Design a protein with these regions (language model features):
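ABC ATPase nucleotide-binding domains
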Residues: 3-4, 195-234
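Conserved ABC ATPase "signature" region
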Residues: 79-94
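Conserved ABC ATPase signature
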Residues: 98-102, 106
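Catalytic Walker B motif of ABC-type/P-loop ATPase nucleotide-binding domains
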Residues: 123-126
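ABC-family nucleotide-binding domains
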Residues: 133
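H-loop/switch region of ABC-family ATPase nucleotide-binding domains
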Residues: 158-159
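Conserved beta-strand-loop-alpha-helix hinge in the C-terminal portion
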Residues: 178-202
Length: 234
């Protein structure tokens, strides 16, 4: 159950919704997608926007025996659109493969491509980084950020705090059906003791606003450079 929620997803935003198991994240997403009907309240979608949801098991979207047929199905048999999407998502070499034979990252790209071919402008993604290695996560993140720059709005339910810290434009935390906090990633993670990144937890005493390893390393280097003695003059 979720209680008295007021969530706004802005155009061009990549909002990561965090929280423990049973917090209500997936239930909220299903209500936004129309799969569950709330007892009270409304879900408002801006005029001209189309919402689609990617479930945690992305394979559940696949009904064909090749990647090409999956894209054609979502493109309503428009081959030009399917080919263009395959090129954009770097799926062209995989068109003859069965969707179940793809890697985790390739499965996510294909699933997102199917939603985009349905002309989705608001994407709800449930645990899209689950099971992905660091490279596949980075590839997925770059795709999502590119979509945001084009005007899409994306809500990601995730336990992956490192992914959220590195790529999200906004973060929110749910607990027991309540939205406890929301904000820009640096302010959000720096203000949390439990739901924060390893980098922030380790370096909080010295660099409280650093939330990624790269930021901590940069701050350490800057601090060391400032302490280096100036060379003697003359």
């Amino acid at each position: 159950m979720y209680k008295r929620q007021d969530v706004t997803l802005h155009q061009g935003e990549l909002l990561c919704l965090l929280g423990g198991n049973g917090a209500g994240k997936t239930t909220l997403m299903q209500a936004l997608a129309g799969f569950r009907k709330p007892y009270r309240g409304k879900v408002k979608l801006a005029k001209g926007q189309r919402l689609c949801m990617l479930p945690q098991n992305a394979r559940s979207l696949f009904v064909a025996d090749t990647v090409e047929k999956e894209l054609l199905d979502s493109a309503e048999q428009d081959k030009a659109k399917a080919v263009q999407m395959a090129e954009r998502l770097e799926l062209t070499p995989l068109l003859a493969r069965h969707p179940y034979d793809l890697s985790g990252g390739e499965i996510q790209r294909l699933a997102v491509g199917k939603l985009l071919l349905r002309e989705a402008t608001v994407l709800l993604l449930d645990e899209p980084t689950k099971g992905l290695d660091a490279y596949a996560k980075a590839e997925l993140a770059q795709l999502l950020l590119a979509l945001c720059r084009e005007g899409a709005s994306i809500l990601v339910v995730t336990h992956d705090v490192e992914f959220a810290a590195r790529y999200a434009t906004g973060c929110a935390l749910m607990f027991d059906g309540l939205l406890l906090s929301e904000g820009e990633p640096h302010a959000f993670f720096a203000g949390n003791r439990f739901y924060t990144t390893d980098a922030n937890r380790i370096a909080a005493e010295h660099f409280p606003m650093d939330i990624t390893c790269e930021e901590v390393i940069a701050s350490c280097r800057s601090s060391l450079s400032a302490k280096e003695p100036e060379p003697p003059r003359g």
